[in-house]
Amino acid sequence: MSGPNIVTPAGREHTDIRHVDETQLIVDDAEVADDDSSELGDSIASSQQTTSSIASSIWNFQLENGRTYHRYKEKKYQYPNDEKETERLDLQHELCLLTLNRTLGLAPPNDENSKVNRVLDLGTGTGLWAIDFGDVHPNAEVLGVDLSPPAAEAPSNVGFEVDDVEEPWTYTQPFDYIHSRFMTSSISNWDQYIQNSFDNLTPGGYFELLEVGGQLQSDDNTLRPDSAVVKSGKLLREACAILGRPFQSIPSLVDVMKEVGFVDIVMTKYKWPMNSWPKDPKHKLIGTWSLHNNLEGIEGWTMAAYTRALNWKKEEVQAFLVDVRNGLKDKSMHAYMPIYAIYGRKPE
């Protein structure tokens, strides 16, 4: 199978790492006392029911503390897969599109004119990224894999498999583009994960990560260390480490990519404001979506992690999250979550 028809400088085999940080965010003082709008539903793609070739037993999910989780490889992944999480993942997909200026990624295969044949979406979630990519590239064969089956209608060139990406990869043909989004705290061995991606690419193919930094930051020291928001992040990182899938230092993955053989590596940093505290319209909008993503996701991110690893009770988690949610809305803390897009090319 031939690789994607992407023009690159002849003989370019060096590693070109570009760290791009967006300009420092300015506080919108007029908005400090206001609440973020909750009317986002009309622009969030809702999941649709469809038939599937996946065995019915896969749909037999596990109920735990009021949330459902994947049955296949039970308890390996600590985040839920129920309708509430599905809706949040769809919201998060829109947040990613806002961040990347309505593109699905920064790697060259995302150019609508690129000729890409086989594409793999790791940890596909609700499958929206794979579906969107398949719509833009109707001649590409797109495969999304996850521990839970997506429940979205897909075009004929997009398929889904329930699989564990940490097991040996058994694909019979390589891919031209492998995409991975928000897998930190879900992977136990990143060296192997990236090696598998490299090994399953065609020469000249691209691997791309979009990852969350995992720890809130502020440029003006307004993020209070004793706040419930900061405490919740520390506890989550502690729990994920105990569960064997710790949060990663995302910039360090550039070195891993270099070691396995990727070249032309580019890393771009973005900022997701904690709420709508920034003044500029783009980051204010991203902050509004980010707040809703966090408010909808915080229980799912913490419930299994805290109860399984830290031995909290369900009621303790819920009581703690009252303060966390209030903290997320606090516009006096000019916090943001760093988001990293990293891609590299397998040499010809």
Name what the model sees in each region.
Residues 83-118, 128, 132:
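Conserved alpha-helix/loop element of class I SAM-dependent methyltransferases that forms part
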Residues 191-206:
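A short glycine-rich, Lys/Arg-flanked "PGG" loop and its adjoining helix->strand segment in the class I
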Residues 113-177, 192-195:
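Class I SAM-dependent methyltransferase SAM/SAH-binding core
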Residues 2-81, 87:
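N-terminal auxiliary segments of SAM/dcSAM-dependent transferases
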Residues 185, 206-297:
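Conserved catalytic/acceptor-binding region of the Class I
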Residues 187-189:
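Short N-terminal helix/helix-N-cap motif within the alpha/beta-hydrolase-1
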